[in-house]
Amino acid sequence: MDTQKKERINRRSFLHSAAGVGAGLVFSPIASGQKRSRKKTDDINVALLGAGEQGRVLMNICLKIPGIRFKAVCDIWTTYNLQRASRLLKRYRHENNAYVDYKEMLDKEKDLDAVIIATPDFWHARHTVASLEAGLHVYCETAMSNTIGGARRMVHAARRTGKLLQIGCQRRSNSRYLYCYDKLLKDRKVLGRIAAVSAQRNRVAKTPMGWPRSASIDSATLEEYGYESMTQFRNWRWYKGLSGGPVASFGSHQIDVINWFLGTNPSSVMAGGQTTYLDKKNRQWYDTMMAVYQYQTDQGPICVYYQILSHNRFGGYFERFFGEQGTLELSQTLNQAIVFPELINSDNKVWAGYVKEGFLVGHGEMMKMMDRLTVEQIAKTFFVEESLPLPRIVNIKDMPKGIIWPANRRVLAVPVEMNKPVHQPHLENFFDVIRGKAKLTCPPEVGYQTAVSVLKVNTAAETGRKLEFEPAQFKA
C-alpha cells in the first residue's frame, strides 16, 4: 500500500471512528488528541452540494473555521453558481473539483469526510441519502425536506449507515438561545407558567429573482433536475413540489425553537393562507400565512400563534414566550434576548436579585448603580409596577456592545453575546462531533419532528380544518 493511500485511510478512519461515538459520547482532551499539536489528520475534507445564495453563505462561514478543507463543489448552474464558488475557494487555496452531477462527485471524490447540502428542498432527501450511503457525514439546510416521507428516508439512512446528519436549525447552537433555554427556562423558570407563544417572520419578498440571460441553464438540464424554466429554478421556494411552502422554508427555524423550549411537539394546528401581494402566475404557495398550534405540556395547555407576511416587515422576526411572571423575546435577526418582568404576578425582589448576581442585566442607569445598591433598593428603584406602555426598541449608546435595549427601564437582557455569523456555531458543532468532541444539537430525529410540525400546516390551510397530531407521527 503506498504512503499517500495509507495516510488517507488513516485520516478518514480516525475521523469516522471518532464521529461514531461522538453522537453519544464526548471525548476527553487526551482521547481526542488536543494535547498534541494539530496535524493534517484533523482536517475535515468537505464538499459543497448546492452553491447558490445559501450555499455560499455556509461556504464563506466554513472558510473561517480552522481545519475545514473544501475538495469539491457541485451545482447545476455551471456558468454562475458553480464557477463563482469554485473560483472563490481556489482564491483561498482550497483546491477543488467542480461537478454538475452529484452522483459523479460522490463516486470520484474518495477523500471526502462530509457534505454540506444547500440545494432546494425537494432535492434534500435524495442528496442526503446518497451522501450518507457514500460513507459521508451530512449537514443539511432547512427545511429538512418538502415532504414527510423524504424527511423519514433521511432519518432511516442516517441510522442505517451510522453516519452523522445535522439538520440546519441553527438556533439550537446559538449561545443566546442556549442560555435562555438552560438558565432562564430550565434552571430558574423565570417566566413561571407559560400560557402562550407568538412568533413571526415578516418581510417584504423580492420580486421574482432574475438571472443574466447569457448565463441561462439549457432546457434539457433544467428538465433533468426537475424545473420547468429558469424562472422556476430561480424562484423555487414559491412552487409546490419544489419546496414545502413558506412555513416549512422559513418557519422551520422558529417552530423548532418553540418545540425545543416547550419540551414537546404540537397536539393540533389550524391555519389559513392567501396570496395578497405576489403575482399568482409565478407563485403557487401563499404569501401570507397564519397558524394556531396547541401544545399539551406538563405546565398545562399552551396556545402558539405563528404568522408569515411577505409584504410588510414590521416587527421582523422573533419568538415570544408569555409566562405568568414575565415574557421572553428572542430574535436571531436582531441578535437579542430580552425579558419583560410581569410584576403583578411576581416578586420584584426576585428580579432585582437576578440583576444583582448578573444572571440578567439591566439598562445603563441600573447597571451603574448596581454596586452601591442592595437587592431591596434595586427592587424599589427599578422594579415598581407602573402603568407603562409596551416596550419600544431603541439603541442606547452606553449599553454593552451588541445588545439592543428597549426604552423601558424594567426590561432586562441576557448577559451573553453572540458575535459570530448565525450559522457558524451550528457548523462548528457539526465538525466538533465529527472529531468526537461534542453531540449534535439537531440530529435527524429532532429535525424530523420539526418537519412534521411545519408541513402539516399546509394541509390545515388547504382544508380549513383543525388537524390533530398523534405522538406516533413524530417518530420516524
Predicted regions and their residues:
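C-terminal helical cap and adjacent loop that interface with cofactors, partners, or active-site loops
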Residues: 8, 17-22, 57, 249-266, ...
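Short, solvent-exposed loop/turn segments that connect beta-strands within catalytic domains
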Residues: 92-94, 296-302
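Predominantly a Rossmann-like dinucleotide-binding segment in NAD(P)-dependent oxidoreductases
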Residues: 50, 54, 160-166, 171-283, ...
